[in-house]
């Protein structure tokens, strides 16, 4: 059994060598042994799940690994393991497509495309189940997938014994949406084209089991591995209130029959994960009672009988709380650190490191950086070096690999210089950063500002040369003389700034693209050359098309492009501003953005510039702007006009006009105002 990461690394290296040499039976033998240990009850961190997830080198991008897994399935079709790996990779694709956004801001096309990837994952796992006498591992993964993205209709059709339809109904109901989802899936492959046969294990599902899908998949997994903590943790997670559950349901589950088979440390781990639902939301630093409640909760969890990895996890979470409370930024780029909080964070991380170094990498590296490089906690720099050294041989963390690359490139943190190893580490970090949502330019900027300017500059140049857009953008800032909120006038270089700006725009960095659009707009105000405005529009449109709602340029790009389009003479441009730009700002913006967009729309529908004037819609948008921000300038300016104030019988006339205009709203304007699926309660809808 691989009790340590180094034992596991040796086993993985042997499996990779066998796979590379097409010794597929040897790969099966190695995987069979590790899986059997897991089936027998092993819970080691570096077991079967870890080996499946990392067998195909994560330093390669997802499309490359998918193709390798497909070839492995073709060359060893009767083995369950390549199909399990293929399904796990498609599971990762689901996450990449859905992204790290909150559930409220994920676009429908992302859900649809993630559903297409889900179908590939489930189909691959059906192959695994058909080829495996005890497929507990993939049954646990199917539990997670059914909770996360729902069961596909075709799987339920197969289990009911009927004819399964993949995408005919979906294409008929929303052809444009299906095309968009296929386009989002395209970097990884095409939609599933054929379904495997249903394995006998999954036949004969009752109607009640269709109604309670999570219970069905959990029982399938537990029937094979009764103490499957991974499956139990998955089920518990989807009892969080955010997924429609409750803390009472979670506690009932922990105290219930399914968890009764667990040893005390395993059941206590479930208790820890239950508490994480609320501990994950950081308290207000100014609320002493809330802060005390959090500290007491973490202390209470550490009083439980926990295994090493769970205890390390709680310690890392407590350190993150310390980081949140210990970092104060009263003004932008003026950061103060609470020495008591940060010292406690360091103590927590030191204890966690002694228990589980990998946990510190996964859950605490950002906090450890802050302790060592910015808060300058005694001993934190030594711990930082120890953590990096302990994981160098086996880590697949892009964040850790970036720091290891810097250490090996420049001899930092007590490491010897090894240029070849530094290059390998940085290449791995670059490959894994997108999948892990890690910004390597932040590591380079922290290195530049807090450790070594030459080493930081070298990393930025290496990352920029490798095509990392954010690092190119950081180089633009550096050659303007400012990085990480600090001034570096010695680095000002207009020629380099211009060169890296062009490269960053070509590479698609949205911040640099937005800044160039803004600069062109400013230049147009000084010199009204139409070409400048057209270039500005084109760059803003790129930001609008490519940015996600959580990106920093999404809101200002929508606002600025809306203003530019609405200031023109073309009604089509004005309608684009209203429906494609102001609408999303209202539905997805914060309160200030909503107030701005609603005030703009109140003006638009009152005066009817580019769209038909409509007193009813003007009134609706005015009230929305007032609710979002009562002192908004547009509200104060527009209320007398829309409400008919200051005119004889103005208020009553305005009210009657609004009632009449309600029946004149076209469908597109109605759905802009009340939601894309809203339908007015009348029958004379005007066509778009």
Predicted feature residues:
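Hydrophobic/aromatic packing residues within the alpha-helices of TPR/SEL1-like helical repeat arrays
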Residues: 69, 125, 218, 254, ...
